[in-house]
């Protein structure tokens, strides 16, 4: 069985895992998938690692394009996602319907899980800047809990380590037992676009092309939507 290597952001993992399995069954090609935040994967590529297909944030793909590491014209927008708040299923849901209500919910909670900014996850970096801008960083810092780098914030809801979790919506939905409170309100939110591409030097460009075509299919779009992403 031939093999196709894929570097994919965890931002699409909730949808892509099943889609990748479907591709393996239909194509007979084994996928060797490495999951991580876009910055984690970019660091591995900078260190000399390679893949056939990439699924990253648009910023990640563009950074690689500037280095000549993505086949020109191969990039395709797949879906986009915003940042959401989740609680453990059945727990009280705070009001986050306006920026002020969101701010008060953060101040009132006992603990909140988010991605560690140093790991480079888009939502974690954004949240650190957001609470500074809102003037509540000092009040929140003792409450913030981090999963392992590349991990899922909602997992800390299940262990009782966090009362709220903040991350890309599909990443929150990846954890069974989490429940979405809502998206961050209005212009407080951050929208991330996820893009696929073929890495320069791929040993299986035909397989990578076929995978990307499948990820654009109407069936794939339905899966993206069901998992909290907005299909392109």
Where would I find each of the regions flagged by the language model?
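DPxDG-like acidic metal-binding loop motif
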Residues: 55
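Exported/periplasmic ABC-transporter solute-binding proteins
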Residues: 1-34, 39, 43-50, 58-68, ...
């Amino acid at each position: 069985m031939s093999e196709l290597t894929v570097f994919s952001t965890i931002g699409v993992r909730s949808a892509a895992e099943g889609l990748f399995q479907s591709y393996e069954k239909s194509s007979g090609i084994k996928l060797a998938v490495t999951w991580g935040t876009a910055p984690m994967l970019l660091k591995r590529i900078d260190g000399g690692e390679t893949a056939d297909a990439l699924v990253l944030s648009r910023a990640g793909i563009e950074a690689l394009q500037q280095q000549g590491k993505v086949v020109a014209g191969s990039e395709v927008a797949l879906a986009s996602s915003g940042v959401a708040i989740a609680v453990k299923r059945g727990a009280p849901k705070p009001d986050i319907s306006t920026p002020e209500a969101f701010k008060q919910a953060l101040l009132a909670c006992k603990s909140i899980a988010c991605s560690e900014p140093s790991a480079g996850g888009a939502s974690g970096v954004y949240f650190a800047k957001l609470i500074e801008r809102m003037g509540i960083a000092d009040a929140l810092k003792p409450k913030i809990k981090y999963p392992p780098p590349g991990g899922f914030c909602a997992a800390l809801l299940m262990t009782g380590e966090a009362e709220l979790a903040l991350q890309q919506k599909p990443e929150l939905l990846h954890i069974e037992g989490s429940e979405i409170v809502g998206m961050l309100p209005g212009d407080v939110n951050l929208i991330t676009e996820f893009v696929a591409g073929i890495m320069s030097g791929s040993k299986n460009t035909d397989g990578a092309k076929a995978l990307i075509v499948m990820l654009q299919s109407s069936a794939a779009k339905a899966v993206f939507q069901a998992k909290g992403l907005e299909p392109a």
